[in-house]
């Protein structure tokens, strides 16, 4: 890893560090523990709505024995015009050690990490349409548990490619780990940045070949009104319907970062079907975030060897 006290992008992670984090997350899932060198304080600063990521970080922090400080953006001084930098300097000054941050600005963390006075351990909980490293890593853990490897796996990422930070993080890491990528969904959402990672295909043309179907939420809140497509039209043309699921191999799994728009990206009856790993992803997320936090705290000598 390039920055030892922050995990903000999968681009900074080496393949070996990813596999080490997966191994440690799987150990936590089996009951492994760690010991703090002193009381450690955490805060989760989310400037966009979140259920899974925020509560998953909090559960991970509590399982590791951290004291979790509350923060709500709408009742903080951010509502009075305070900058993110000043908010985090305040958090640092009162004695917080670790922060998970979600912010609508892409690369919000660049200026923070360039500031020599900033020494909080930081996990990026999502930046705009940029990166979502913890979601990507829990996805990698879920795939690894299923197949034991990544090399040669065929993965199709389907849905709102243009606005998805999950797509960007996952395509970067999956390609490096040896998977073969395809993209499906409206062709106008497939932009030039995806060309280096895989080809755009019609979903129906590859269903019988893929090992993993990675579905993406349609992010209505990021669309201009002119871009919208009805939910029904999307489901018929690009969604994982029962008819499409029947064409998949018995060993194929499907993932979704959630929240799920049922009967849009995926048919309602498939969300909890035997080949779905959607709720397993959420379960694994706690253990992967434990592994990430432990790694960062070790760099600050806050975890005993």
Swiss-Prot record:
Gene name for this UniProt entry: pyrB
Family in the record: Belongs to the aspartate/ornithine carbamoyltransferase superfamily. ATCase family.
UniProt pathway: Pyrimidine metabolism; UMP biosynthesis via de novo pathway; (S)-dihydroorotate from bicarbonate: step 2/3
Chemical reaction(s) catalysed: carbamoyl phosphate + L-aspartate = N-carbamoyl-L-aspartate + phosphate + H(+)
SUPFAM superfamilies: Aspartate/ornithine carbamoyltransferase
Stated name of the protein: Aspartate carbamoyltransferase catalytic subunit
Organism: Latilactobacillus sakei subsp. sakei (strain 23K) (Lactobacillus sakei subsp. sakei)
GO molecular function: amino acid binding; aspartate carbamoyltransferase activity
Lineage: Bacteria, Bacillati, Bacillota, Bacilli, Lactobacillales
GO cellular component, one term: cytosol
InterPro entries noted in UniProt: Asp/Orn_carbamoyltranf_P-bd, Asp/Orn_carbamoylTrfase, Asp/Orn_carbamoylTrfase_sf, Asp_carbamoyltransf, Asp_carbamoyltransf_Asp/Orn-bd
